[in-house]
């Protein structure tokens, strides 16, 4: 019974608020549909909404340049950041990645030669009980740091391939055949 009463009360309130007499009496309150909301001919809608007083002259130059002043201030603050960003982008695009690639691949391509004695020596070191690069470095196996860095690259490639083989993914190795030929170490090598 109480649900029926509440439904009737909601319906009555809705009917009373949507009647034409109520809408006509609320006309000055409703600013969107009221006559005070209309803009004069030639005046911008934005400026009309911003006017604070009725007597304010909306055609003053300050009203026109309000947004421009704010944007100029933002540009003034952001100009150093834009310069730094442009310099960083120019620096990053000036050195092309393909010009650096041969330098980085040179040491790996040398190891890919099957007749390379260093490659064979790296294989023997890797297959020994102490194949870890840091252990071999402590033992003094490497003459130069460049030789150590080449062995570390060799070691990383071998370790990832053994991980593929031990996980049962040797037929679908994560490396491409070209990479296997270049480095000279496959999953079962």
Swiss-Prot record:
A motif (RxLR-dEER) lies at residues 47-68. One of its GO terms (cellular component) is host cell cytoplasm. Residues 1-23 form the signal peptide. It is found in: Secreted; Host cytoplasm; Host nucleus. Keywords: Host cytoplasm, Host nucleus, Secreted, Signal, Virulence. Induction: Expression is induced during host plant infection. Effector that is involved in host plant infection. Contributes to virulence during the early infection stage, by inhibiting plant defense responses induced by both PAMP-triggered immunity (PTI) and effector-triggered immunity (ETI). The RxLR-dEER motif acts to carry the protein into the host cell cytoplasm through binding to cell surface phosphatidylinositol-3-phosphate. Belongs to the RxLR effector family. This is RxLR effector protein CRE18. The gene is CRE18.
């Amino acid at each position: 019974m109480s649900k029926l009463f509440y439904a009737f009360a909601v319906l009555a309130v809705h009917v009373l608020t949507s009647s034409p007499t109520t809408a006509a009496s609320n006309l000055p309150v409703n600013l969107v549909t009221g006559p005070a909301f209309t803009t004069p001919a030639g005046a911008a809608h934005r400026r009309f909404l911003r006017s604070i007083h009725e007597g304010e002259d909306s055609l003053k130059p300050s009203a026109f340049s309000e947004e421009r002043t704010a944007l100029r201030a933002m540009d003034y603050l952001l100009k150093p950041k834009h310069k730094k960003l442009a310099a960083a982008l120019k620096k990053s695009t000036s050195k092309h990645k393909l010009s650096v690639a041969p330098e980085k691949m040179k040491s790996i391509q040398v190891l890919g030669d099957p007749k390379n004695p260093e490659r064979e020596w790296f294989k023997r070191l890797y297959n020994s009980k102490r194949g870890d690069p840091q252990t071999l470095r402590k033992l003094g196996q490497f003459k130069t740091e460049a030789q150590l860095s080449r062995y570390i690259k060799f070691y990383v490639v071998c370790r990832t391939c053994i991980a593929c083989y031990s996980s049962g993914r040797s037929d679908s190795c994560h490396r491409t055949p070209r990479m296997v030929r270049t480095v000279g170490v496959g999953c079962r090598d």
